[in-house]
């Protein structure tokens, strides 16, 4: 059952609700209870903004005073707490923003369980030895963590609310349809590269972050909503901007006490952008959903899979699409950008590129665009996993909300209501990976050839949690890995690539994150491949 509200898109109109494929009117009182409704309510209708702001600031002051006077929790040490003469956590948060990775690594030298004051507030950090214990503990809830960490109860952030229908659609439809999607992914990639990268055999520069994000967002959108909407620049702008704007809005909202965030969201321009993106996405999906997606396009897609899987369960297709896009675009783009820069800056880049091309041609000629080809691209798989190891998206992950007091295997007690994360630092441990700071593109080929089944990109372990761990590991990782490999096959077989400025850092550390440098550029020129493997 599809439900979404388009009531705030203009002058007052009857409320509209999808029940199956039928659009019916419903009362405003009913719609106020729907998940999307809070994103459609402009706070500007409240009578007195100045009074509201005054009340909020007074409540904030009371909250801050209460927190300052409250006794500090001292059972678990804090490694970057307040220093002498500091009031509040502002400076501690700022220090974490500048050197989060260093603070985490230093903390692990002091204790295996400790607190940090992050940009998003205090949290408990566990060493990697706790990963297997935490991943399946019934009192460690991942969905509640995501909802609390990303304000899913706050207007504009509804996209982060858990939707089991979407998880089921990914697991039962998307993953099982990878084989059928490979040729469409390849065809769309070819179209985009020809239009954006061109066919010139002369070197020319491109903004690496922009061009990869554009490519990934369109390929993903075409797979998720079909060719017509997936190629629409307005739709692509909505889904890509929602993700980037959410990161900014998240940090803005974290500056407010948690209890006041549902109110503060209406005064923050960054949060207003999120509500606008949701409204615009609803407007664009409305014609397709009202007509019936299969009637609109002559083949099934993720919209249809959601409807099939949902059955009588209620879900919101707008939130589902924005959530899917946020998960698919950022992490996929991140890994492609980092991998390309690692390939270009490898000490013997030319040989590595030729080795990759030789493997791609051999495998694709033998298997074509089939799932077996993705399995047999061993060197490409190794290159991707090595980049994810050396330059992960985050230093700590496996976020969990503790729903009741737990005692870990070593006697450590974690209280109910705490937020915990497990660090991914074994990826830099010389006892696990010799020369861990060296990017070795052949590392996981050797491990795989020696019988290490965990050497595959999509195989998460406590030693390499790039896709999480356990039942909450990324459900879309198989689709993401396939999409990334197809895109890189097109890029490396069709273009010579190099990074023009050797002095620019490839990764910027900010808090828990390792971002690709936003100023990175890539030089490309068309190769004369004359290959016949693209059909």
Swiss-Prot record:
The chain crosses the membrane at residues 51-71. It is an enzyme of class 1 (oxidoreductase). Heme binds at residue 474. Its main location: membrane. Pfam families: p450. Its cofactor is heme. Its EC number is 1.-.-.-. InterPro entries: Cyt_P450, Cyt_P450_CS, Cyt_P450_E_grp-IV, Cyt_P450_sf. It is found in: Membrane. GO terms for biological process: secondary metabolic process; terpenoid biosynthetic process. GO terms for cellular component: membrane. GO terms for molecular function: heme binding; iron ion binding; monooxygenase activity; oxidoreductase activity, acting on paired donors, with incorporation or reduction of molecular oxygen. Pathway: Secondary metabolite biosynthesis; terpenoid biosynthesis. It is a single-pass membrane protein. Disulfide bonds: none annotated. Keywords: Heme, Iron, Membrane, Metal-binding, Monooxygenase, Oxidoreductase, Transmembrane, Transmembrane helix. Cytochrome P450 monooxygenase; part of the gene cluster B that mediates the biosynthesis of austinol and dehydroaustinol, two fungal meroterpenoids. The first step of the pathway is the synthesis of 3,5-dimethylorsellinic acid by the polyketide synthase ausA. 3,5-dimethylorsellinic acid is then prenylated by the polyprenyl transferase ausN. Further epoxidation by the FAD-dependent monooxygenase ausM and cyclization by the probable terpene cyclase ausL lead to the formation of protoaustinoid A. In A.calidoustus, the austinoid gene cluster lies on a contiguous DNA region, while clusters from E.nidulans and P.brasilianum are split in their respective genomes. Genetic rearrangements provoked variability among the clusters and E.nidulans produces the least number of austionoid derivatives with the end products austinol and dehydroaustinol, while P.brasilianum can produce until acetoxydehydroaustin, and A.calidoustus produces the highest number of identified derivatives. Belongs to the cytochrome P450 family. This is Cytochrome P450 monooxygenase ausR. The lineage of its organism: Eukaryota, Fungi, Dikarya, Ascomycota, Pezizomycotina. The gene is ausR.
């Amino acid at each position: 059952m599809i439900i979404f509200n388009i009531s705030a898109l203009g002058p007052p109109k009857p409320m509209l609700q999808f029940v199956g494929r039928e659009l019916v009117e419903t009362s405003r009182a009913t719609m106020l209870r729907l998940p999307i409704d809070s994103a459609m309510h402009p706070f500007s209708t409240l009578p007195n903004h100045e009074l509201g702001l005054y009340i909020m600031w007074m409540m904030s002051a009371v909250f801050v005073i209460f927190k300052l006077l409250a006794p500090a929790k001292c059972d678990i040490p804090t490694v970057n707490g307040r220093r002498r003469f500091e009031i509040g956590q502002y400076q501690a948060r700022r220090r974490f923003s500048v050197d989060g990775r260093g603070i985490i690594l230093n903390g692990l030298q002091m204790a295996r369980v400790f607190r940090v004051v992050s940009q998003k507030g205090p949290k408990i950090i566990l060493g990697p030895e706790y990963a297997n214990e935490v991943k399946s503990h019934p009192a460690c809830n991942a969905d509640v963590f995501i909802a609390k960490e990303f304000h899913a109860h706050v207007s504009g952030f509804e996209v982060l609310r858990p939707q089991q229908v979407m998880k089921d659609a990914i697991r039962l439809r998307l993953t099982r349809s990878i084989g059928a999607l490979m040729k469409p992914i390849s065809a769309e990639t070819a179209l985009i590269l020809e239009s954006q990268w061109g066919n010139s055999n002369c070197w020319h520069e491109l903004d690496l972050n922009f061009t990869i994000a554009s490519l990934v967002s369109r390929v993903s959108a075409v797979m998720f909503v079909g060719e017509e909407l997936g190629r629409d620049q307005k739709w692509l702008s909505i889904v890509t901007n929602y993700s980037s704007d959410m990161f900014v809005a998240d940090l803005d909202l974290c500056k407010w006490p948690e209890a006041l965030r549902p109110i503060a969201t209406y005064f923050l321009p960054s949060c207003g952008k999120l509500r606008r993106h949701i409204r615009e996405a609803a407007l664009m999906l409305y014609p397709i959903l009202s007509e019936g997606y299969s009637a609109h396009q002559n083949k099934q897609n993720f919209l249809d899979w959601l409807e099939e899987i949902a059955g009588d369960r209620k879900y919101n297709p707008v939130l589902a699409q924005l959530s899917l896009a946020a998960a698919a675009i950022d992490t996929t783009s991140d890994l492609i950008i980092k991998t390309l820069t690692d390939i270009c800056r490898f000490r013997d880049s030319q040989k590595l590129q030729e080795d990759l091309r030789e493997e791609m041609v051999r495998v694709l000629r033998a298997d074509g665009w089939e799932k077996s080809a993705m399995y047999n691209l061993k060197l490409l798989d190794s290159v991707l996993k090595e980049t994810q190891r050396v330059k992960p998206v985050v230093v700590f992950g496996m976020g969990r909300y503790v729903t009741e007091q737990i005692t870990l295997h070593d006697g450590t007690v974690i209280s109910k209501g705490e937020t915990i994360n497990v660090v991914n630092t074994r990826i830099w441990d010389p006892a696990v990976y010799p020369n861990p700071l060296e990017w070795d593109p052949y590392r996981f080929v050797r491990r795989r050839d020696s019988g290490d089944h965990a050497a595959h990109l999509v195989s998460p372990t406590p030693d390499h949690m790039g896709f999480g761990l356990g039942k909450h590991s990324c459900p879309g990782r198989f689709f993401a890995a396939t999409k990334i490999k197809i895109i890189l096959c097109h890029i490396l077989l069709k273009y010579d690539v190099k990074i023009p400025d050797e002095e620019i850092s490839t990764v910027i550390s900010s808090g828990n994150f390792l971002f690709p440098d936003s100023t990175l550029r890539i030089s490309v020129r068309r190769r004369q491949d004359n290959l016949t493997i693209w059909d």
